[in-house]
UniProtKB/Swiss-Prot annotation:
Pathway: Amino-acid degradation; L-histidine degradation into L-glutamate; N-formimidoyl-L-glutamate from L-histidine: step 3/3. It is found in: Cytoplasm. It comes from Aliivibrio fischeri (strain MJ11) (Vibrio fischeri). Pfam families: Amidohydro_1. InterPro entries: Amidohydro-rel, HutI, Metal-dep_hydrolase_composite, Metal_Hydrolase. This is Imidazolonepropionase. The lineage of its organism: Bacteria, Pseudomonadati, Pseudomonadota, Gammaproteobacteria, Vibrionales. Catalyzes the hydrolytic cleavage of the carbon-nitrogen bond in imidazolone-5-propanoate to yield N-formimidoyl-L-glutamate. It is the third step in the universal histidine degradation pathway.
Length: 408
């Protein structure tokens, strides 16, 4: 062993079939052995594990969970839209704000004007809040460039962030986020650019794991999204979708049928769509931050998702317009208070189910032999406190590939 963690209380998130427990209950006085960045032992204290003089970390009866995974973010952008926040509070509708040059296209303009270095430093600063909440893996999307060069610029920033030693990154191409101004009323031609030029070039440069789309009346049609998905799959990329946020176009069922790892937002998802998620083992990613920030009233179909046993992930959806919230624990609380998830569902949503939403369920999101050694060590007594209490610095340290990172 390279490193052994002793005197810890474990919340493994490993399911009943594998352990006989539910993975959420606290198992006291556990030892974890790590070698080459992976978990090699989990169980009762075992003196033989200490042979070879590994580095011993006494957790002093702290609570240990899998490292948190924020599986849906728009972390990279320039500018901010605080002025729009004020306008919305005054009752000005989004459509009017957009006509005045606001909305997503204002972020596109600012992001296009920013250099790669500027975007990198802005994103690294934003990461700090997520780190304090125990995040060890983050998904980051492009989507504020909307040209070949600017989408690649954003994805190069994602790649630079992935080189940080204390954060793992999953990269998503979201060129189909909005129709850029130069393609106004020519969205099919913009889809041509995405499929014929942007996706092949991103694959050539190895800059993305997934391709995402915004399937909505104000975004792209199911026919257009299907074409993007087919192109992505043909080039060996995984797929996911922003679907059923504002209306029910059938984007979730389409994405699931094509093998999507997750569909996200899903406030308007119906039973047909839920059945499609079950059939194709697609994760439903809930984004309560956007629901809260936009003062929406249409709740996701939580009862149906439970009935059909669809895994539910939750994420910050961190972005400048509709969820400028860099706190995954705040989002966990919102998932409970706004969407009526239980604290257990909330914790699964940022660990094992979030890993599945990124296609990483065999590597992260649980603490078990063979998994990557990504943990969060908390000064807490029970896992329910993670959703219950906000603003208190409960995190002692994050562990990424077995390396320890103490938070400021």
């Amino acid at each position: 062993m390279d490193r052994v963690f002793i005197n810890l209380h474990l919340v493994s998130m490993v399911n009943k079939q594998q352990t006989g427990s539910d993975g959420y209950q606290v198992v006291k006085d556990v030892m974890i052995g790590v070698r080459n960045g992976k978990v090699e032992y989990v169980g009762e204290p075992c003196p033989s594990i200490l042979h070879g003089h590994p580095d011993i970390i006494d957790c002093a009866h702290a609570l240990v969970t899998p490292g948190f995974i924020d599986c849906h973010t728009h972390l990279i952008f320039a500018g901010n839209r605080a002025n729009e926040f004020e306008q919305r509070l005054q009752g000005i509708p989004y459509e009017e704000i957009a006509k005045q040059g606001g909305g997503i296209l204002s972020t596109v303009q600012a992001t296009r004007e920013a250099s790669e270095d500027e975007l990198y430093h802005l994103a690294v600063h934003r990461l700090e809040g997520l780190k304090r909440d125990g995040v060890t893996t983050i998904e980051i999307k492009s989507g504020y460039g909307l040209t070949l060069d600017d989408e690649i610029k954003m994805l190069k920033v994602v790649k630079r962030i992935s080189e940080l030693p204390d954060m793992k990154v999953s990269s998503t191409l979201l060129a189909a986020h909005a129709v850029p101004p130069e393609y106004k009323n020519r969205s099919d031609e913009y889809i041509d650019l995405i499929c014929d030029t942007i996706i092949p070039q991103v694959v050539k440069l190895n800059l993305a794991n997934h391709v995402d789309v915004f399937c909505e009346g104000i975004g792209f049609s199911t026919k257009q999204c299907e074409r993007v998905f087919r192109t992505a799959l043909k080039h060996g990329l995984r797929i996911k979708g922003h679907t059923e946020q504002l209306s029910n176009l059938g984007g979730s069922a389409l994405a699931a049928a094509m093998g999507a790892d997750s569909v996200d937002h899903i406030e308007y998802l119906d039973e047909h769509g839920v059945k499609a998620l079950t059939k194709n083992n697609t994760v439903a990613t809930l984004l309560p931050g956007a629901f809260y920030f936009l003062k929406e009233t249409k709740l996701p179909p939580i009862a149906l998702l439970r009935q059909y046993e669809v895994p539910m992930a939750i994420a910050t959806d961190f972005n400048p317009g509709t969820s400028p919230i860099a706190s995954l624990r705040t989002i966990m609380n919102m998932a409970c208070t706004l969407f009526k998830l239980t604290p257990e569902e909330s914790l699964r949503g940022v660990t094992c189910h979030a890993a599945q939403a990124l296609g990483l369920q065999n590597f992260r999101g649980k603490i078990a032999v063979g998994m990557e050694a990504d943990f969060a060590i908390w000064q807490l007594e029970s896992p329910a406190e993670l959703s219950y209490r906000l603003g208190v610095p409960d995190l002692i340290a994050r562990v990424v590939d077995g390396e320890i990172f103490h938070e400021k």
